[in-house]
Amino acid sequence: MRPGLWETCFWLWGPLLWLSIGSSGNVPPTTQPKCTDFQSANLLRGTNLKVQFLLFTPSDPSCGQLVEEGSDIRSSEFNASLGTKVIIHGFRALGTKPSWIDKFISAVLRAADANVIAVDWVYGSTGVYYSAVENVVKLSLEISRFLSKLLELGVSESSIHIIGVSLGAHVGGMVGHFYKGQLGQITGLDPAGPEYTRASLEERLDAGDALFVEAIHTDTDNLGIRIPVGHVDYFVNGGQDQPGCPAFFHAGYNYLICDHMRAVHLYISALENTCPLMAFPCASYKAFLAGDCLDCFNPFLLSCPRIGLVERGGVMIEPLPKEVKVYLLTTSSAPYCVHHSLVEFYLKEKRKKDTSIEVTFLSNNVTSSVKITIPKQQLEGRGVMAHPNPQCQINQVKLKFQVSSRVWRKDRTPVVGTFCTAPLPVNDSKKTVCIPEPVRLQAGVPAFQDLKIACV
């Protein structure tokens, strides 16, 4: 190139090049923004793992600080003297940020003085579910390496609490497995079922993955795992068909995820409200509804487990039992909390047919009902029902003797008996309240009785 042409090009393009790259003396270097949000992905980008660790603190609960290396953590607002909550989302079909994550983080930080680490693996969880499953081991290793940096700063293993949603629950279990079960706690919010129901203990969440492991099951007949995987396993409303969720396909996407995501909303509600989501150990949901499991003595020595940021779920016995199924009922919307009651009806005389009685609690325009059945040639029938208000706020009970709709099976003979009720857990007979006089019930005709129970 001739010198004249070279000089011409230099003076024409040189200043533009200098302006585009900046100078070390006059232009300040660009800095990363303080707050970082979740990534977005799509099917065209595949499912390559691209993990972000976002730190949220009590001093700035809405700002996610990107922390990747040890130096990032040391220069952040991370407080090694506080407990650390690690939140791991699950499969993201559309590659979007979880809609619940901001509210979840805020609820945790309001309920606990802690560090919150949100694990953003949207890239690796997008597209095909089975591709996301293949990323679980690699993701678990990345999280484990990140936690090792926290341990170097003086964080104790026992102060780390992993909260995993769906597929994220099994990621948390694998991380706990890498730490030989010495992490403080793992909470699985409806742990994923597909590919994990028959998986080995090393591949899925189980009670050996942390000092305390709990799981909340809300969709065992579809996307959630149906087997117990922790020390305590909450089967909410039996673990499936949650109140308020659509029952038919025409509801579309909401039909698919409503039951599954109810575990997340229950946990948020438990953090935001004082009404306890208390559960009761029982062999089966059917037995629980039948009134066969009224306290928590076996195996918890009366300490009934509760959903939320309660130390070991409120279970303080040693050693901890494993894979204990506990059951609770809820309402159809937040705060979901109910007060469980035992309801009983004692016949004055035995009958030759089964006797069905509908029991309804009424208080402040809120009603709850349950049907109890007294088998033929027996005197007692019982069941468990749920009501949003405590018993002392229930004004009346409505009793209705139900008969068969089939003409040839109708029995119009009135029944006479005594109604009794008690709030769960029923630890002694002093809690039981009975209507003073026997009640005479005509077939199909409701009878209203006042309830007078003192608040304590």
UniProtKB/Swiss-Prot annotation:
Enzyme class at the top of the EC tree: hydrolase
Keyword Signal: yes
Cysteines joined through disulfide linkages: 245-258, 282-293, 296-304
One Gene Ontology biological process: lipid catabolic process
Extent of the signal sequence: 1-25
EC number: 3.1.1.111
Glycan-modified residues: 365
GO cellular component: acrosomal membrane; extracellular space
Gene Ontology MF annotations: phospholipase A1 activity
Predominant subcellular localization, coarse grouping: secreted
InterPro entries membership: AB_hydrolase_fold, Lipase, Lipase_LIPH, Lipase_N, TAG_lipase
Key words, A-Z: Disulfide bond, Glycoprotein, Hydrolase, Lipid degradation, Lipid metabolism, Secreted, Signal
Catalytic residue list: 166, 190, 260
Recorded superkingdom: Eukaryota
Matches recorded under Pfam families: Lipase
Catalytic activity: a 1,2-diacyl-sn-glycero-3-phospho-L-serine + H2O = a 2-acyl-sn-glycero-3-phospho-L-serine + a fatty acid + H(+); 1,2-di-(9Z)-octadecenoyl-sn-glycero-3-phospho-L-serine + H2O = 2-(9Z-octadecenoyl)-sn-glycero-3-phospho-L-serine + (9Z)-octadecenoate + H(+); 1-hexadecanoyl-2-(5Z,8Z,11Z,14Z-eicosatetraenoyl)-sn-glycero-3-phospho-L-serine + H2O = 2-(5Z,8Z,11Z,14Z)-eicosatetraenoyl-sn-glycero-3-phospho-L-serine + hexadecanoate + H(+); a 1-acyl-sn-glycero-3-phospho-L-serine + H2O = sn-glycero-3-phospho-L-serine + a fatty acid + H(+)
Cellular compartment(s): Secreted
Family: Belongs to the AB hydrolase superfamily. Lipase family.
Function per UniProt: Hydrolyzes the ester bond of the acyl group attached at the sn-1 position of phosphatidylserines (phospholipase A1 activity) and 1-acyl-2-lysophosphatidylserines (lysophospholipase activity) in the pathway of phosphatidylserines acyl chain remodeling. Cleaves phosphatidylserines exposed on the outer leaflet of the plasma membrane of apoptotic cells producing 2-acyl-1-lysophosphatidylserines, which in turn enhance mast cell activation and histamine production.
Protein name: Phospholipase A1 member A
